[in-house]
Amino acid sequence: MKDTIVLYPNLGRGHLVSMVELGKLILTHHPSLSITILILTPPTTPSTTTTTLACDSNAQYIATVTATTPSITFHRVPLAALPFNTPFLPPHLLSLELTRHSTQNIAVALQTLAKASNLKAIVIDFMNFNDPKALTENLNNNVPTYFYYTSGASTLALLLYYPTIHPTLIEKKDTDQPLQIQIPGLSTITADDFPNECKDPLSYACQVFLQIAETMMGGAGIIVNTFEAIEEEAIRALSEDATVPPPLFCVGPVISAPYGEEDKGCLSWLNLQPSQSVVLLCFGSMGRFSRAQLKEIAIGLEKSEQRFLWVVRTELGGADDSAEELSLDELLPEGFLERTKEKGMVVRDWAPQAAILSHDSVGGFVTHCGWNSVLEAVCEGVPMVAWPLYAEQKMNRMVMVKEMKVALAVNENKDGFVSSTELGDRVRELMESDKGKEIRQRIFKMKMSAAEAMAEGGTSRASLDKLAKLWKQS
């Protein structure tokens, strides 16, 4: 039987892609290992809940990976139904409940795989709310469980340190002055850098993250999608902290390569634009805006007078939350598409982000600060404007702006709304100012460092090799 590593990704698209790319990376450098990826699959007639999590949209991606990388095996596992009394939760938190209720199904799948292969390790996405002991207790041999942290070392430091600061957050939660929080290896942060769901330390989300931190501390190791050159202080703090028992394996940047997706004419349009002249605006698979915010973005782009390629989700979010898809003409200011057709391109719903960022014409990126997107921009040397929307993205913004210094931050009001003037000013500053040039030079150096980390003898390659050696010896 072949030595097998089982990867168990979260339902979210960004988490799935990152885990699949980790599997590809392992196979590239350690082909003697076999990779099986567990995929939670909704019932034949999916509920609105599971549809919200875009399980169906992942099917096309999985089919593409199966066709292009047949050495990766996908093992489908039934997704458990949620109890009727489950509270309303945003998608990234809802996925926690779905995985938690699917623990028994995952355990059965692992028992099935163990009969046909030699399981050497199980790698679980940190956002899968499963107790590793419950998953592995019925396996004949002691299979080590590792956690894959799909974001960076800085947010991992916050997560693992959160149980330490949580009592203070509760004690100070009603004070008017913002609490200054010092996490080892990071700049000083405040509660404003936390995910929106964690502003109240007594919230459901905070209780979940406390449990996740506790669970991760019991793993055999934590695999992190980062590299030393961009988060040196955070990595050092985690590695040297005696209170963080699991060894750290920084194997990044683990990013997706363009794999022949339909480009909707984006690349042909970019071919006609001058070098480093276009700003890409793309906000991830869950990045939806209200009608008012979309119009404000459009006005801001006109004010910036820059070339742009804007990916617009036609399902509204925010105050206008709706699954109904509207036309671009219904969503954008009257005449906007006609007025900007010489300088801009607007694409509905989706575009091949990795391929676009790698194009010579792209010189800036307005991003939601999802970590996969940040790493893709770093690997292509594209400077950023940071506009976080959900999950850990506000913390990522702090890292991008203060620690890495590869982005400008947009300032939103207390409701999260960004004005056209603010967006237009930040885009123009990125593309035309001396500060923008400094950021461009800095991120180009990080691009070189990313390549070095992944090359033979690099820090990330060394971490991967060390990890694979442990697996083979287990």
Curated annotation (Swiss-Prot):
Catalytic residue list: H15 (proton acceptor), D125 (charge relay)
Keywords, in A-Z order: Glycosyltransferase, Transferase
Keyword Transferase: yes
Propeptide span(s): 1-49
Influence of temperature on activity: Optimum temperature is 45 degrees Celsius.
Record: residues binding an anthocyanidin: H15, A391
Pfam family, one: UDPGT
CDD domains (UniProt xref): GT1_Gtf-like (cd03784)
The keyword Repeat appears for this protein: no
Reactions catalysed according to its record: a 7-hydroxyisoflavone + UDP-alpha-D-glucose = a 7-hydroxyisoflavone 7-O-beta-D-glucoside + UDP + H(+)
Tissue: Expressed in shoots, leaves, cotyledons, epicotyls, hypocotyls, roots, pods, seeds and flowers.
Listed EC numbers: 2.4.1.170
Superkingdom per UniProt: Eukaryota
Activity response to pH changes: Optimum pH is 8.5.
Residues that, per the record, bind UDP-alpha-D-glucose: T150, A351, Q353, H368, W371, N372, S373, E376, E392, Q393
Primary role: Involved in the biosynthesis of isoflavonoids. Specific for UDP-glucose. Can use genistein > daidzein > formononetin > quercetin > kaempferol > 4,2',4',6'-tetrahydroxychalcone > apigenin > aureusidin > esculetin > naringenin as substrates, but not cyanidin, trans-p-coumaric acid, caffeic acid, benzoic acid, m- and p-hydroxybenzoic acids, salicylic acid, salicyl alcohol, and hydroquinone.
Assembly behavior: Monomer.
Similarity annotation: Belongs to the UDP-glycosyltransferase family.
Name under which the protein is recorded: Isoflavone 7-O-glucosyltransferase 1
Recorded name of the encoding gene: GmIF7GT1
